[in-house]
A protein has these predicted regions:
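Conserved long alpha-helical elements within nucleotide-processing catalytic cores of c-di-GMP signaling
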Residues: 2-25, 35-59, 68-72, 76-77, ...
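Catalytic/regulatory signature loops of cyclic-dinucleotide turnover enzymes
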Residues: 136-161, 171
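Extracytoplasmic/periplasmic beta-strand context in beta-sandwich domains
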Residues: 4, 116, 150-151
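GGDEF/GGEEF active-site signature
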Residues: 52-132, 143, 154, 171-172
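Active-site core of bacterial EAL-family cyclic-dinucleotide phosphodiesterase domains
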Residues: 27, 168-172
């Protein structure tokens, strides 16, 4: 769905969260090394990868969750009414599903591993301003990429070493 649809959905979900004294999780995904993949294997393969990732997201979320292609190789999923640790585990399930796929590239007769990084923030916990929550999810995503990619990071976990994040992931 496009940006206008996304902005309307964000507005609706924020109103719902405020009225129902609930939370809204923002999961921001970015396919790791997408530009390199696109440059190496071509735009048709890049488009297939984006479509595959969209389908993986849809398989891993609830009907009430809202997935949006945010731009380029970035996707956002809005998840209402869930504890942030559970929302993180949804992000991790999506991450693992993509990692398990080996993208078949017919012209090269090879399968390519592709990974994704994810940042998570929550309204109204991280901010009562949804634009700031989205920015914080983006900051967590940026941190995930900076520590080696292929990991999900909650905004509160920024600055935690990767080893500690991986330990907490295994315990979940």
């Amino acid at each position: 769905a496009n940006r206008h649809y996304f902005e309307q959905k964000v507005k609706d979900e924020v109103e719902y969260a405020a009225k129902s004294d609930s939370v809204l999780n923002v999961l921001m995904f970015d396919i790791d090394n997408f530009k390199g993949f696109n440059d190496t294997y071509g735009h048709i393969s890049g488009d297939k990868l984006l479509a595959l990732f969209s389908n993986i997201i849809l398989q891993c979320i609830r009907k009430s969750d809202i997935p949006v292609r945010y731009g380029g190789e970035e996707f956002v999923v809005l998840i209402r009414d869930l504890d942030i640790i559970i929302a993180k585990s949804v992000g991790d399930r999506i991450r693992r599903q993509l990692e398990k796929q080996r993208i078949y590239l017919k012209q090269y007769d090879e399968r390519q591993k592709v990974t994704v990084s994810c940042g998570v923030a929550q309204f109204p916990v991280h901010s009562k301003n949804i634009k700031e929550v989205i920015e914080k999810a983006d900051q967590a995503l940026y941190y995930a990429k900076s520590i080696g990619k292929n990991i999900v990071v909650i905004y509160d976990e920024i600055d935690m070493p990767r080893e500690a994040l991986e330990r907490s992931r295994q315990e979940a």
